[in-house]
Amino acid sequence: MSRRGTAEEKTAKSDPIYRNRLVNMLVNRILKHGKKSLAYQIIYRAVKKIQQKTETNPLSVLRQAIRGVTPNIAVKARRVGGSTHQVPIEIGSTQGKALAIRWLLGASRKRPGRNMAFKLSSELVDAAKGSGDAIRKKEETHRMAEANRAFAHFR
């Protein structure tokens, strides 16, 4: 039996302006080289641009985008008898949100455009509407899981 105590699960903190955990998760994923103030600037500019584009609550657009991109199921490589199978596994809500944020940021980095705030706002608006690169990534993941459904018993 382990002598070490079980680690407490950390709860996500909320950002100073919107008091929203999703915004803080987004900030922590966009962060590079420890420059958190720059990450906050990028996010807040993107939120302002969403407000101008859609003329609705930008946080609801953000929530809708993340909800649309969050996958329910993914595939995991599993080695069975010398061959590697892609085994479909269910994803929890926290891990799903983390994946969705990662995909949204990856898709917005690939976008052509002036700056990161502009690209991120465009990607979030597209994802909320049900289009964009991040949505395509989710659909591709679900297709992979559906195609490899026969290996679900290897879990």
Swiss-Prot record:
Keywords: Chloroplast, Plastid, Ribonucleoprotein, Ribosomal protein, RNA-binding, rRNA-binding. It comes from the Eukaryota. SUPFAM superfamilies: Ribosomal protein S7. GO terms for molecular function: rRNA binding; structural constituent of ribosome. It is found in: Plastid, Chloroplast. InterPro entries: Ribosomal_uS7, Ribosomal_uS7_bac/org-type, Ribosomal_uS7_CS, Ribosomal_uS7_dom, Ribosomal_uS7_dom_sf. It holds the Pfam family Ribosomal_S7. One of its GO terms (cellular component) is small ribosomal subunit. GO terms for biological process: translation. Part of the 30S ribosomal subunit. Belongs to the universal ribosomal protein uS7 family. One of the primary rRNA binding proteins, it binds directly to 16S rRNA where it nucleates assembly of the head domain of the 30S subunit. HAMAP family: Ribosomal_uS7_B. This is Small ribosomal subunit protein uS7c. It comes from Cabomba caroliniana (Carolina fanwort). The gene is rps7.
